[in-house]
Every structure is written in C-alpha cells, then in structure tokens.
A protein has these predicted regions:
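Short, Lys/Arg-rich nucleic-acid/phosphate-binding segment
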Residues: 58-64
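Short acidic, hydrophobic short linear motifs in intrinsically disordered regions
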Residues: 19-34
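Basic, amphipathic "hinge/linker" alpha-helix immediately C-terminal to the N-terminal HTH DNA-binding motif
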Residues: 64-70
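Short, flexible, solvent-exposed loop/turn segments with mixed acidic/basic and small polar residues
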Residues: 53-57
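Short amphipathic alpha-helical interaction segments
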Residues: 2, 35-52
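Short alpha-helical segments that sit at the start of domains
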Residues: 1-21
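Short, amphipathic alpha-helical interaction segments positioned at domain boundaries
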Residues: 70-102
Length: 104
C-alpha cells in the first residue's frame, strides 16, 4: 500500500471520527486507519504528510484535526486524490456551502 492510499485512509478516519474542537492523536488515527501492519513506517510518513495539507490543523503531539474553514480544499482532495464520489462527500460533509465551487 503506497503512502497516498494511507493518506486517504487517514482522511477517512478524520472525516468520520472527528470530535469538534479536539485534535485526534497520531496513535488513535493510525489505530483506526486501514492499512497492512507491515506498512507502519509508511503510515507514520503518511500522517506526517497529512499534517502539511491546507485542510488539516496540526497541534503537534496532541494530534491533528480538520480545519472547518478549509472544507473546500478537503472535498477537492478527497474527490481528486482519494476517489470519493460526490454522494459520499455530500453525505459526510454536511456543513459545507461551497458545493458549486468543487470541480467535479
């Protein structure tokens, strides 16, 4: 499994398991993400790569959380890079008002 696939798996965890206002620690996120056990080093690299995305707020050792003001960038990333379809995006990310700005 490559790093990009793991980044997408981690994004799925953040979208489905977020706790408003609280960052999710790396060990919790990686424990919920789907990847083969032998890819632990790649998963840690993927988590570090995700920290630098514009739709993620990095809280250092406390973990990461989604940036509510950057849902457009998150949705575009999930659609373009992770293969999420429009239906799932609209189902999972309900409080976004810029759907007409997404490049489908």
């Amino acid at each position: 499994m490559d790093e990009q696939a793991i980044v997408c798996s981690i994004c799925r965890v953040l979208v489905t398991s977020h706790d408003y206002g609280k960052p999710l620690p790396q060990d919790v996120v990686l424990g919920k993400a789907s990847f083969p056990a032998h890819n632990g080093a790649t998963a840690k690299a993927a988590f570090d790569a995700l920290r630098r995305k514009p739709f993620v707020v990095d809280h250092g050792k406390r973990g990461v959380q989604l940036d509510n003001s950057q849902f457009g960038a998150l949705i575009q990333f999930l659609y373009d890079e992770c293969g999420w379809d429009r239906f799932e995006l609209e189902l999972r990310i309900k409080h976004f008002e810029g759907w007409n700005e997404i490049r489908w």
